[in-house]
């Protein structure tokens, strides 16, 4: 059974849009750096859902959307590892991971 036959296009695009909006809202309103990283991952997953959806509905002969998703997942994993390492370093130095207390220009 193909993925395209299970869900309607509108449902998957709506799911991707909701996840993107929730992640973006969380990204711009979060005060915690770890929460901001999690919201950024949610935004990237919404983009992945849209890539796979468009690939399955409009480009059934090729797997270009899935290849883009693999690249995005690899970049997201590296981004999460580097981001968490930066957060850990900032916590060791400042004893806080709140974004409003974080200013390297001092």
UniProtKB/Swiss-Prot annotation:
It is an enzyme of class 7 (translocase). Pfam families: Oxidored_q2 (PF00420). It catalyses: a plastoquinone + NADH + (n+1) H(+)(in) = a plastoquinol + NAD(+) + n H(+)(out); a plastoquinone + NADPH + (n+1) H(+)(in) = a plastoquinol + NADP(+) + n H(+)(out). It is a multi-pass membrane protein. InterPro entries: NADH_UbQ_OxRdtase_chain4L/K, NUOK/Mnh_C1-like. It is found in: Plastid, Chloroplast thylakoid membrane. GO terms for cellular component: chloroplast thylakoid membrane; NADH dehydrogenase complex. Keywords: Chloroplast, Membrane, NAD, NADP, Plastid, Plastoquinone, Quinone, Thylakoid, Translocase, Transmembrane, Transmembrane helix, Transport. Its EC number is 7.1.1.-. The chain crosses the membrane at residues 6-26, 34-54, 67-87. GO terms for molecular function: oxidoreductase activity, acting on NAD(P)H, quinone or similar compound as acceptor; quinone binding. GO terms for biological process: ATP synthesis coupled electron transport; photosynthesis, light reaction. HAMAP family: NDH1_NuoK. PANTHER family: NADH-UBIQUINONE OXIDOREDUCTASE CHAIN 4L, NADH-UBIQUINONE OXIDOREDUCTASE SUBUNIT ND4L. NDH is composed of at least 16 different subunits, 5 of which are encoded in the nucleus. Belongs to the complex I subunit 4L family. NDH shuttles electrons from NAD(P)H:plastoquinone, via FMN and iron-sulfur (Fe-S) centers, to quinones in the photosynthetic chain and possibly in a chloroplast respiratory chain. The immediate electron acceptor for the enzyme in this species is believed to be plastoquinone. Couples the redox reaction to proton translocation, and thus conserves the redox energy in a proton gradient. This is NAD(P)H-quinone oxidoreductase subunit 4L, chloroplastic. It comes from Psilotum nudum (Whisk fern).
């Amino acid at each position: 059974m193909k993925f395209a036959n299970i869900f309607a296009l509108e449902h998957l695009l709506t799911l991707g849009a909701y996840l993107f909006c929730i992640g973006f809202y969380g990204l711009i309103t979060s005060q915690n750096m770890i929460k901001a990283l999690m919201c950024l991952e949610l935004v990237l997953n919404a983009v992945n859902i849209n890539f796979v959806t468009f690939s399955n509905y409009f480009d059934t002969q090729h797997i270009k959307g899935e290849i883009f998703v693999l690249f995005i997942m690899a970049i997201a994993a590296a981004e999460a590892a580097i981001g968490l390492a930066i957060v850990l370093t900032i916590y060791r130095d400042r004893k806080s991971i709140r974004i409003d207390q974080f200013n390297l220009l001092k």
